């Protein structure tokens, strides 16, 4: 009986320690560089299906996350999202209006945004949903782009510098 009690006590102690670790939210802070070899093929080249930044600078606190995405020959795109899901304005190139919100969902970060701009064909509205997940020094972002009812999803993998 004593062995049984000790075994159960040890199992419970180990299990109790694992639960908070498994539920802990991911930390996304750092500098991340796109790894083209691990990413979807359709995100690079002159006409990518969905654009991803070549490099991300991320600063995360308990209340918010600040992201600056840079690419060659492109203006940086930056935003600071409140992690409670509040809507914020995203700093985008001139002529583009973008709003977004972010929320931690377990170990993932989910960012939704809406981009609008005028074109010769009329006003364009594009919705995005990004799901971020981290495994060690690798950040994976799965982004879905929806415009006029048509959706496309691509994946980008970033390495931490």
Where in this protein do the model-derived segments appear?
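Bacterial N-terminal signal peptides that target proteins for export
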Residues: 1-8
């Amino acid at each position: 009986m004593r062995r049984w009690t000790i075994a159960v006590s040890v199992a419970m102690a180990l299990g109790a320690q694992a639960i908070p670790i498994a539920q802990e939210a991911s930390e996304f802070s750092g500098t991340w560089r796109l790894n083209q070899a691990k990413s979807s093929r359709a995100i690079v080249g002159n006409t990518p299906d969905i654009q991803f930044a070549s490099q991300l600078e991320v600063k995360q606190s308990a209340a918010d996350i600040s992201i600056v995405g840079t690419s060659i020959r492109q203006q940086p795109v930056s935003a600071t999202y409140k992690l409670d899901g509040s809507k914020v304005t995203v700093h985008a190139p001139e002529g583009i209006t973008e709003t977004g919100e972010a929320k931690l969902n377990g170990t993932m970060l989910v960012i939704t945004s809406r981009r609008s701009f005028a074109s010769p064909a009329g006003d364009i509205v594009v919705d995005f949903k990004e799901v971020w997940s981290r495994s060690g020094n690798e950040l994976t972002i799965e982004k879905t782009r929806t415009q006029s009812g048509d959706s496309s999803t691509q994946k980008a993998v970033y390495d931490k510098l």
